[in-house]
Amino acid sequence: MQWEVVIGLEIHTQLATQSKIFSGSATTFGSEPNTQASLVDLGMPGVLPVLNEEAVRMACMFGLAIDAEIGKRNVFARKNYFYPDLPKGYQISQMDLPIVGKGHLDIALEDGTIKRIGVTRAHLEEDAGKSLHEDFSGSTGIDLNRAGTPLLEIVSEPDMRSAKEAVAYVKAIHALVRYLGICDGNMAEGSLRCDCNVSIRPKGQTEFGTRCEIKNVNSFRFIERAINSEIQRQIDLIEDGGKVVQETRLYDPNKDETRSMRSKEEANDYRYFPDPDLLPVVIEDSFLETIRAGLPELPPQKVERFQTQYGLSAYDANVLASSREQADYFEEVVKIGGDAKLAANWVMVELGSLLNKLGVEIDQAPVSAAQLGGMLLRIRDNTISGKIAKTVFEAMAAGEGDADSIIESKGLKQVTDTGAIDKMLDEMLAANAEQVEQYRAADEAKRGKMFGFFVGQAMKASKGKANPGQVNQLLKAKLEG
């Protein structure tokens, strides 16, 4: 039987506010346990929550960016459940009247097509604390620093049909919230976490199958692996005569499998009711218009502009626009270096490789956009070749200065003097007389392969400094003359 996969995602986005959603406690990551927890966060009697307006503003920014309905009147509710790191015994969230209603987000698939994914809603809520199992022998510690940190939970429609589509959607959300400046997107620190709802059904069937939720997956790679693992588990289970049970599961990356955590709760299990300590939030049109006016250029618009303005391919434009910092870096390089396609290649390949090696983001790049742009100018005016440029780039990355000073101090200027190149080629060909005779006796197909040998010998003789274009032109004339 052929199966169709149905996937919906819930993405928990930690908002980049300086203080918590209902208290004045700081939200700094990595502080000593329980040093950023106020009486409100601890759920002490007699204290009242006060809503952080910045969290509301950030949620509205997201809603406007996905062309969603904004709840002009939204209500906070108590979600009741017991967990050791939830001191109040309930979580303040939103149920019936969320701040962001239906919207959509377009994602780019691997084949270059665009697919629209519906967003059901996005609601504000507070994060829970954190249980510390490793630091205690025979017991568990509780760190409430995270309790009360503002979250925007983004709930998609079940519109995705493969793990790759799900990853593309999460990447699009990740890029968007970073562009908006409402989340740092650091998945390793838990700033963006994903719950994956997965079900299967016979191809052609419209009724949904029984879904299972995979909780708290925190990397793009693990999202893809977790979903594929769960898909295969459900297929094997049904084809062996079993039945999928609705439940919450965890993904084990070491075993590459999901395992049962608990039965899946429904909304009525949480006994939602409006929080009596918080008034309904009324959002005025003037508030939204101020936010709308301040929205930055968003990833889809930037991708389109990069293609039309700079002549980049859809793939290159999507890669460069995947983060606001990278897009800004690229445009700064183009402003100085002039050639957009050359700049795109260096930013994506050479700089990308360097950043991966160092394990840092582009805002910590050891080579500034101004330095890289200056080096590209020297490639374009034939001061250095593309090969020598890699040596210059490595020196800039090592902190040895800008391109001009490195080229000067290391004597890396390209040899463009025709007489000097001509003499060097004569010496190289004399040293390879046997290969010259073989070349002249060969047919066109073999000559093409052999020509590369002579070019390599010429560049070796010049220590990479000879202008490749001139070498090719003069060498061809000498070999075929």
Swiss-Prot record:
Keywords: ATP-binding, Ligase, Nucleotide-binding, Protein biosynthesis. This is Aspartyl/glutamyl-tRNA(Asn/Gln) amidotransferase subunit B. Heterotrimer of A, B and C subunits. Allows the formation of correctly charged Asn-tRNA(Asn) or Gln-tRNA(Gln) through the transamidation of misacylated Asp-tRNA(Asn) or Glu-tRNA(Gln) in organisms which lack either or both of asparaginyl-tRNA or glutaminyl-tRNA synthetases. The reaction takes place in the presence of glutamine and ATP through an activated phospho-Asp-tRNA(Asn) or phospho-Glu-tRNA(Gln). Its EC number is 6.3.5.-. It holds the Pfam family GatB_N. It catalyses: L-glutamyl-tRNA(Gln) + L-glutamine + ATP + H2O = L-glutaminyl-tRNA(Gln) + L-glutamate + ADP + phosphate + H(+); L-aspartyl-tRNA(Asn) + L-glutamine + ATP + H2O = L-asparaginyl-tRNA(Asn) + L-glutamate + ADP + phosphate + 2 H(+). It comes from the Bacteria. Gene3D superfamilies: 1.10.10.410, GatB domain, N-terminal subdomain (1.10.150.380). Belongs to the GatB/GatE family. GatB subfamily. One of its GO terms (molecular function) is asparaginyl-tRNA synthase (glutamine-hydrolyzing) activity.
